[in-house]
Amino acid sequence: MRELLTRSKIELAPPALDKLWRFHQLLRERNEDRDLTRLIEFESVVIKHYVDSLYVGKLVKLPSPLVDVGTGAGFPGIPLKIGYPDIELILAEQRPRRVMFLNDAIRLLGLRNVKTFDHRVVSRSFTEPVRGVITRAVEPITKTLLRTSGATDIGSQIIFMKGPGVDEELREAVRDFKRDYKLIRDQPYSLPHTTHDRRLVIFERLTPRSVVAESAEEETGDDDTEDQA
């Protein structure tokens, strides 16, 4: 694991590397009965889950408290917490089996200032103030902006880890939310020594904390992104 991380320009101190390895062992042990990830092959798990999650921390200063919306089995939140232990983190995931796994991982790894939110994140039910939102290829940008609007305030950052084909939804978000949000970053990048292209998209909240629109209550399909190439 260390070699793959180093090749990808990810350097972790020995205690953090040990925690990430223990998390990997737990993920592997619990995957079959908890439906945590479709990735099985070791290098794919390291690159597409751990490197993909940790690399964003090299590109942006992570806001705190930070909510990871649709975290699934803990991506990107748990690797980010391991690599950047000072952040306060909320792992938002509605599927009970995955929430059980997340709570076990938090306890077994001794992660502090981390908690789970085991319901759908919608604007009227998730109102805990946060300085940042992060989400990894869960849903269109507009839906995340809507359903986290009850928790973000002026200056809060909403960080999207996307694939390269995000232009249409990005244009829609900029057009529809110009009063409440400003696009402050749109950065294409690739995971080092791979063909995996990514886009880092960041919006900043312009208006005080309040529900932007009732349509935030619409159903969306929270999912993880282990099949992203």
Question: PLM features: residue spans?
Answer:
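Class I SAM-dependent transferase core
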Residues: 1-67, 97-114, 219-225, 229
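Short capping/connector residues at structural and topological boundaries
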Residues: 41-44, 50-51, 83, 126, ...
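Hydrophobic alpha-helix-in-membranes signature
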Residues: 64, 75-78, 163, 187
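Conserved beta-strand/loop positions that form the S-adenosyl-L-methionine
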Residues: 69-71
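Conserved SAM-binding loop of SAM-dependent methyltransferases across substrates and taxa
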Residues: 73-86
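S-adenosylmethionine
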Residues: 87-229
